[in-house]
């Protein structure tokens, strides 16, 4: 679209990019933000997701302010946190971490929080937090070993990717499925449209 304002996605996540593409939105640039995602001691899951999404947006904003082509763009950042009660699970990088996450999730309810932070061309910050409740079946040691062997969990909040093999572990999901994938699509599109970003599809009137 000629004259469409630019959109920068402050993420290197293929899943978040694919979800935006699914909604007919193609970011003009990707600016993954390098922030420390370690939870603060005693930090609650909601607060952690909100803080990290904001931190990613602020870091990416500093980057695009130095780029003549991207300065004044819309900027979208997000962070996903998986928690059992108040316990925040790691974004697993090691097999032991993944195994521990899966044992903790086995047969239990957990919550997935994704905070979305939008920075407008006038550098106003707008934020939404979406919560989804998920219940896993009871996982056998064979289930856990097989999934860990797949490698799908690497870098994923809570040590699993719901859009892959782990989707077969889900007994019940209440709320946004795309939130569990990494970007709550309805809320994200509503946020963009509500701040004046042109949404291509007519199926959503983001007022």
UniProtKB/Swiss-Prot annotation:
Catalytic activity field: dTTP + H2O = dTMP + diphosphate + H(+); UTP + H2O = UMP + diphosphate + H(+)
Principal EC category: hydrolase
Gene3D superfamilies tied to this protein: 3.90.950.10
GO cellular component: cytoplasm
Keywords: Cytoplasm, Hydrolase, Nucleotide metabolism
E.C. no: 3.6.1.9
Keyword Hydrolase: yes
Residues at the active site: 79 (proton acceptor)
Compartment(s) where it occurs, according to its Swiss-Prot or TrEMBL record: Cytoplasm
MF GO annotations: dTTP diphosphatase activity; UTP diphosphatase activity
Cofactor(s) the protein needs: a divalent metal cation
Marked site: Important for substrate specificity: 15, 80, 163
InterPro entries: ITPase-like_fam (IPR029001), Maf-like (IPR003697)
GO BP annotations, alphabetical order: nucleotide metabolic process
Family of the protein in this entry: Belongs to the Maf family. YhdE subfamily.
Protein name: dTTP/UTP pyrophosphatase
Taxonomic path: Bacteria, Pseudomonadati, Pseudomonadota, Alphaproteobacteria, Hyphomicrobiales
């Amino acid at each position: 679209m000629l004259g469409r304002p630019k959109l920068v996605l402050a993420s290197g996540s293929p899943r978040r990019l694919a979800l935006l593409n699914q909604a007919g939105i193609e970011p003009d640039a990707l600016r993954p933000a390098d922030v420390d995602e370690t939870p603060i001691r005693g930090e609650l899951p909601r607060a952690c997701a909100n803080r990290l999404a904001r931190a990613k947006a602020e870091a990416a904003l500093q980057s695009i302010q130095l780029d003549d082509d991207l300065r004044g763009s819309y900027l979208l950042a997000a962070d996903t946190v998986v928690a059992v009660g108040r316990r925040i699970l790691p974004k697993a990088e090691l097999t032991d971490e993944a195994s521990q996450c899966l044992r903790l999730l086995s047969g239990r309810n957990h919550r997935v929080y994704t905070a979305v932070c939008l920075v407008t061309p006038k550098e106003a910050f707008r934020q939404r937090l979406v919560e989804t409740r998920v219940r896993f079946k009871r996982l056998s040691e064979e289930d856990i070993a097989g999934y860990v062997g797949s490698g799908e969990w690497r870098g994923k909040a809570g040590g699993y990717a719901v859009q892959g093999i782990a989707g077969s572990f889900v007994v019940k999901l209440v709320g946004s499925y795309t939130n569990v994938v990494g970007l709550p699509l309805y809320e994200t599109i509503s946020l963009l449209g509500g701040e004046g970003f042109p949404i291509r599809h007519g199926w959503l009137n983001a007022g």
